[in-house]
């Protein structure tokens, strides 16, 4: 087990993509290891939840690293609507061209096919009122990096950067099946805004004000 002093938080670089995609895979099963579910396309989730942030929001992207490599990341998007618009025009067309929409009964799709369907039919969430929580955040840590305080530090650093740029608030989504993450966000000061769906498809959206209003 690595000592806490072995961990480094640093700005993300384009060269971090492969390592960050791996973190996304290893946390891609409701916070647990998703590798068994995506053996046919290990980068499927990373193309949605990592790549666009490294490309479009590098100043709001942080990497957690230890001697064994990249073990976590935290990403932010200053204006979610602008981010999604850029994703729609600059990122998603390439995904759709490379990965055809799956056919057949959706109930029989693999996890990978479900993600490939997301490429073609994305679901963009923005909170109401949008002006209160226009930014959004995303974080994942490998198991070896959890419980050391680095997740909190990374989130606080990204929120500080958002605050300095004038964001009044941020939101994020967490699976209803990921109770540890929900508790983590509560301890960071996020409060529940709305629940969408249920079970494996259910998501809890949470928000936090970044100013003193």
Locate the predicted segments by residue.
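Conserved acyl-donor/pantetheine-binding loop and adjacent beta-alpha core of acyl/acetyltransferases
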Residues: 81-138
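Active-site rim helix/loop that mediates acceptor-substrate recognition in acyltransferases
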Residues: 38-61, 67
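Conserved beta-strand in the GNAT
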Residues: 63, 69-78
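Conserved GNAT-fold acetyl-CoA-binding loop/helix
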Residues: 29-49, 86-100, 104
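Conserved catalytic-core motifs of GNAT/GCN5-like acyltransferases
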Residues: 81, 171-174, 186-206
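Conserved GNAT acetyl-CoA-binding A-motif
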Residues: 133, 162-174
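Conserved N-terminal entry element of GNAT/NAT acetyltransferase domains
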Residues: 1-15, 212-213
